[in-house]
Amino acid sequence: MGRASRLEPVLLSMDLRPLIPRGIYRVRYLDHRTYRAWGEDKLEIHFGVVDIGEAFETVLSRHYPVKCLGKCGAKGKFKPRTATSSLPVEFYQCHPDAPRITRLDRIPMSKWTDGIYNARVETVEKNFQQKPLPRQLQYSVIRELLGRADM
């Protein structure tokens, strides 16, 4: 019987991020954290690629603008900036049967653990100043979660 692998999202801000070909990949939730960058609060959700191939088990991130509630960090509490921002929209695209939330700080992150999701992966080719990055420094990110892959 095969041994289930355990992906460890130990990506530090100074580490080089993975680069895989752009496209649609099936991913699973690993964990999340909140952080502050350039004066803005963010939520970073780590996903692991489950498609067999060269990208298998690659850890990719999806970043959302949020407001941190309390201290930022691993499993930090947050709320999306608005009810129609990308986090609530993608949450309900991936969990269409989830009940309607009445407060933005009540998005159940535990729901992410119960499925496989389709993610559109793109390559970051420019830095924050919109200057081209050398190929060696380019990396992949999840631009959008498209919905459940296991339904």
Predicted features along the sequence, with ranges:
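Short beta-rich binding modules
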Residues: 1-151
